[in-house]
């Protein structure tokens, strides 16, 4: 969240709306990204017209399926929360609670109902996990291959210039782009350094930007929320 205010400034200046997927991760300031310290930031983004969705409460990574129907379960490893770094088995109902808890907190602090979508940390899923989430009302959203903007990669091997040039070359219409509100391990921060020239460059190529509410793959699910 360290660069979140700068990202918000760029998006506002460029008149671009995005979909934020949020988990309650550790932050340098405050009591987590969905804590009270950052609540005004989320409220302001919702008021500006951005969409919100769940990234699971404890940024919980799926590792493997650990049970099958009619009692699906998953081996998981959260990267936040009281069980950070631990590997354990979570029932489908417990995983749904992970999704719902983040969505409920977003609604509470922003006064805006999140979209019935979620993104699994790392994009790691199984057919069974996706089916279990769908059963409790959430569709999973990944990203396009060209939409992986590389802000998680080491800056020593993936410079901002190289990442910008790759995205400007490869992004196509309909692609879902993925970036973060700061990556602890990256020395040369991707945002906002790359974000604004990327938006400007894609606009010059004739692109416009929409939230997932308007994406053809997710519009039907998003229409459930007004």
Short names for language-model regions:
Residues 124-170, 206-218:
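His/Asp/Glu-enriched short active-site or ligand-binding loop at hydrolase and phosphoryl-transfer sites
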Residues 108-133:
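Basic- and aromatic-lined ligand-binding clefts that recognize polyanionic substrates
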Residues 1-90, 94, 98-115, 190, ...:
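Active-site beta->alpha N-cap acidic-glycine motif
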Residues 24-29, 124, 147, 183-187:
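Short histidine/acidic/glycine/proline-rich micro-motifs that form metal-
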Residues 34-38, 159-163, 191-195:
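Charged helix-capping and loop-helix junction motifs
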Residues 13-14, 18, 187-226:
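C-terminal domain-boundary segment and adjacent tail
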Residues 18-22, 51-56, 116-120, 139-144, ...:
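Structural recognition of the beta-strand scaffold that forms the well-ordered cores
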């Amino acid at each position: 969240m360290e660069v979140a205010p700068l990202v918000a400034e760029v998006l506002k200046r460029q008149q671009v709306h995005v979909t934020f997927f949020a988990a309650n991760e550790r932050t340098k300031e405050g009591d987590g990204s969905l804590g009270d310290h950052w609540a005004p930031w989320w409220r302001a983004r919702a008021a500006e017209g951005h969409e919100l969705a769940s990234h699971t409460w404890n940024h919980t990574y799926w590792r493997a399926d650990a049970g099958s129907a009619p009692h699906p379960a998953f081996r998981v490893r959260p990267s936040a929360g009281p069980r950070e770094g631990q590997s354990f088995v979570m029932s489908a109902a417990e995983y749904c609670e992970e999704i719902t808890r983040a969505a409920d907190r977003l609604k509470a602090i922003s006064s805006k109902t999140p979209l019935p979508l979620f993104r699994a940390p790392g994009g790691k899923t199984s057919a069974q996990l996706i089916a279990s989430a769908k059963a409790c009302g959430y569709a999973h959203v990944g990203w396009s291959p060209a939409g992986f903007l590389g802000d998680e990669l080491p800056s020593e091997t993936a410079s901002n210039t190289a990442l910008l040039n790759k995205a400007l070359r490869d992004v196509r219409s309909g692609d879902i782009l993925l970036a973060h509100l700061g990556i602890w391990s990256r020395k040369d921060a991707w945002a906002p350094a790359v974000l604004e020239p990327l938006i400007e460059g894609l606009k010059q190529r004739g692109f416009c930007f929409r939230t997932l509410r308007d994406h053809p793959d997710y519009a039907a699910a998003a229409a459930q929320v007004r």
